[in-house]
């Protein structure tokens, strides 16, 4: 017969022991539950996508070494992984087959760039140009355009802006909307003293990327300073502040010149500043002020179109954090 002790007859020691046992069971149950939950939720760390792609590409080449497409994908993946010397080996093997010469030469140029071998990279980019420039689709050849741009960039890195300009002009003839090429051409024009050309291409660059990219405005400021256009240089400097994510520095500079020689650009700059703040009503007023002085001004018309009468939300991206990296379109 099982003996059951009535709770009313338990002494304090028995009651304490019972409580401790219950608490122990609760603790053990919690530990077991957490353990099973963690086990159920745990998954082995997945292999990074680029590593999986690399493994697959290596296997594809082992399975079918004569397949040029697979070898090209392997070489490109090596570049993505920063394994430039391995990539060059693969590109060389492709070139030995006399197939996909343009693509392999272009890829190898990028690998040489990664290794810092600029002369070798320039030789390969020039080889791509020599192959592609006479092609039927040369005027829309993205690889040709990128090669021209890269040759211009290399010339600028070597302090040769006059040599860079023809390459960059040819790149822009293929793709006029390349903001990076516009910016680089602008800096080359500034360096060679062609300030009017610099203003044209740098204004085009900031038209494509109006905020978040301060370098074109800084180049404009340098060009205007060289040309003796003090007010415009101050406008460009203020816009560089705005693009760099420091509107509090830009606003007083723009307000100080909005009644002078840079009135239209300063008013547009203030419109853009308030648009990025989300104050569409004030932005609309500044855009309207610019249009009063220059009724056909495209940036002012576009800005007013974005903010409407002040009630529409700005579609522009947020300003960057000060010091954050930024750039133009690829």
State each model region's role.
Residues 65, 99, 133, 142, ...:
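Short coil turns that delineate tetratricopeptide repeat
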Residues 59-64, 130-143, 214, 221-225:
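Flexible helix-coil transition and linker loops at the boundaries of alpha-helical arrays
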Residues 80, 114, 131, 150, ...:
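Register position in tetratricopeptide repeats
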Residues 2-73, 77-92, 96, 123, ...:
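N-terminal leader/linker segments that initiate helical-solenoid repeat arrays
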Residues 70, 104, 137-140, 147, ...:
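TPR alpha-solenoid repeat register
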Residues 73, 107, 143-146, 150, ...:
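Canonical tetratricopeptide repeat
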């Amino acid at each position: 017969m099982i003996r059951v002790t009535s709770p009313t007859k338990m002494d304090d020691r028995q009651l304490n022991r019972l409580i401790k046992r219950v608490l122990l069971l609760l603790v053990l149950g919690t530990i077991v539950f957490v353990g099973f939950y963690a086990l159920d939720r745990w998954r082995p760390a997945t292999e990074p996508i680029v590593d999986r792609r690399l493994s697959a590409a290596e296997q594809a080449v082992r399975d079918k070494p004569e397949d040029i497409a697979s070898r090209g994908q392997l070489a490109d993946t090596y570049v993505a992984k920063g394994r430039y010397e391995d990539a060059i080996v693969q590109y060389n093997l492709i070139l030995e087959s006399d197939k996909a010469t343009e693509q392999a030469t272009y890829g190898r140029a990028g690998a040489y760039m990664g290794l810092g071998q600029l002369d070798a990279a320039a030789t390969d980019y020039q080889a791509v140009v020599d192959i592609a420039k006479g092609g039927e689709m040369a005027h829309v050849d993205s690889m040709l355009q990128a090669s021209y741009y890269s040759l211009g960039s290399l010339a600028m890195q070597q302090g040769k802006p006059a040599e860079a300009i023809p390459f960059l002009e040819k790149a822009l003839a293929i793709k006029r909307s390349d903001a990076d090429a516009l910016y680089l051409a602008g800096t080359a024009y500034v360096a060679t003293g062609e300030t009017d050309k610099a203003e044209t291409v740098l204004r085009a660059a900031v038209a494509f990327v109006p905020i978040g990219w301060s370098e074109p405005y800084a180049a404009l400021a340098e060009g205007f300073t060289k040309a003796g256009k003090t007010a415009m240089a101050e406008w460009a400097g203020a816009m560089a502040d705005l693009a760099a994510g420091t509107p509090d520095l830009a606003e007083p500079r723009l307000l100080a010149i909005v009644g002078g020689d840079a009135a239209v650009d300063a008013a547009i700059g203030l419109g853009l500043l308030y648009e990025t703040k989300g104050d569409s009503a004030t932005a609309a007023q500044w855009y309207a002020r610019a249009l009063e002085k220059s009724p056909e001004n495209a940036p002012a018309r576009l800005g007013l179109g974005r903010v409407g009468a002040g009630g529409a939300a700005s579609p522009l991206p947020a300003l960057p954090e000060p010091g954050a990296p930024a750039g133009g379109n690829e």
